[in-house]
């Protein structure tokens, strides 16, 4: 454990940030899993609806630096291709 006041403060701030980041990452992954679940079920309408809900969340997390923008683009491209195959 830190002894210096500023190091103690940084430890507290880091733990707080870690919890927020973990929560946001979990939320994002949950929305992505919903799209995959709809694709697995073969329901194109549900998959498209889940994708439309997931897309702004992934974009927002990429903009905030939680994930890289290319990873967000890759998720969206792969899911779009899979949804289009359901036709």
Curated annotation (Swiss-Prot):
| Leader sequence segment | none
List the protein's name.
Answer: Small ribosomal subunit protein bS20
The record's section on InterPro entries has:
Ribosomal_bS20, Ribosomal_bS20_sf
The residues that cross the membrane are: none
Encoding gene, per UniProt annotation: rpsT
Any GO BP:
translation
Q: Write down the superkingdom of origin.
A: Bacteria
Keywords of this protein's UniProt record, alphabetized? Ribonucleoprotein, Ribosomal protein, RNA-binding, rRNA-binding
Main function: Binds directly to 16S ribosomal RNA.
Q: Name one GO cellular component term.
A: small ribosomal subunit
What is the organism field in this record? Shigella flexneri serotype 5b (strain 8401)
Under HAMAP family, the record lists: Ribosomal_bS20
Q: Which GO terms describe its molecular function?
A: small ribosomal subunit rRNA binding; structural constituent of ribosome
Its family remark reads:
Belongs to the bacterial ribosomal protein bS20 family.
């Amino acid at each position: 454990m830190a002894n210096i006041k500023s190091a103690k403060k940084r430890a507290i701030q880091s733990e707080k940030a870690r919890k927020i980041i973990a929560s946001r990452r979990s939320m994002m992954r949950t929305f992505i899993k919903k799209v995959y679940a709809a694709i697995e079920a073969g329901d194109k309408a549900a998959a498209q609806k889940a994708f439309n809900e997931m897309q702004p969340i992934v974009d927002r997390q990429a903009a905030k630096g939680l994930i890289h923008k290319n990873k967000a683009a890759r998720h969206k491209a792969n899911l779009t291709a899979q949804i289009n195959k359901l036709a």
